[in-house]
């Protein structure tokens, strides 16, 4: 992904896309990337009506022309080099993946509510995904590091998050935070014994866990005082930390090859996404960039 050269921006014709559009302009200016704007549109056909191939092509053409007129206003304020395309399709996720590959996109931007199910998109998307919720340019970036990163995909995922956090924030003159949820000792050590033992294990676990997170952060040349840790489940703790730290953009990871089917600590990104009121950059292990 880094450095960014091409950002694919998905807009919905006739809808309020102001947040996504303005954010794409800000990201292009901050990173120097070129924008490719895609507007997937449904063919102009009544539901349940089966058209002959020629009429179907005409319906698709009419939908693309109508969307093209809608795009004219955006074209007037777009930076130099921006390209626009309206494509008639009944399968927007497939079209988005195809265009991301065609343009070799380094980042996909779209509104947080554009697709109800992100799994088909993330299964094949060749780049990270930024889900936009707000108009404001990000000023505070936070990376969500997962606990129990013993296996290779989880370790790489934490590296991906820290790498992007470290490189993106300076582009915007932004601040950095690293957020994490302290695992529940009762879940990790089910046979620990009495309450005293549980308390001892909890204290020891918190110290060990915090030190582990801080080491990952300092290994990337960042200060350990950027780390914020709270005890509890990630789907509860992370949204609370996002609110406390007034995070604008949360870097969130998924390790599942099939998208959101799995997430660190057994939690799903699907549980966290609806609970955070900020933009979210979704990263996967394959988004890691080897150091030059």
Regions found by a protein language model. Name each.
Residues 1-3, 26, 54, 58-61, ...:
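Structural beta-alpha unit
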Residues 36-38, 84-88, 130, 177-179, ...:
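General small-molecule cofactor/ligand-binding pocket signal
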Residues 55-69, 197-208:
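A short acidic, glycine-rich active-site loop
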Residues 1-54, 141-199, 219-222, 275, ...:
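Small/aliphatic-rich secondary-structure junction motif
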Residues 107-124, 138, 249-275, 289:
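Glycine-rich, Arg-bearing micro-motifs that act as flexible, cationic patches
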Residues 109-112, 129-134, 280-284:
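Short beta-strand elements of ligand-binding domains
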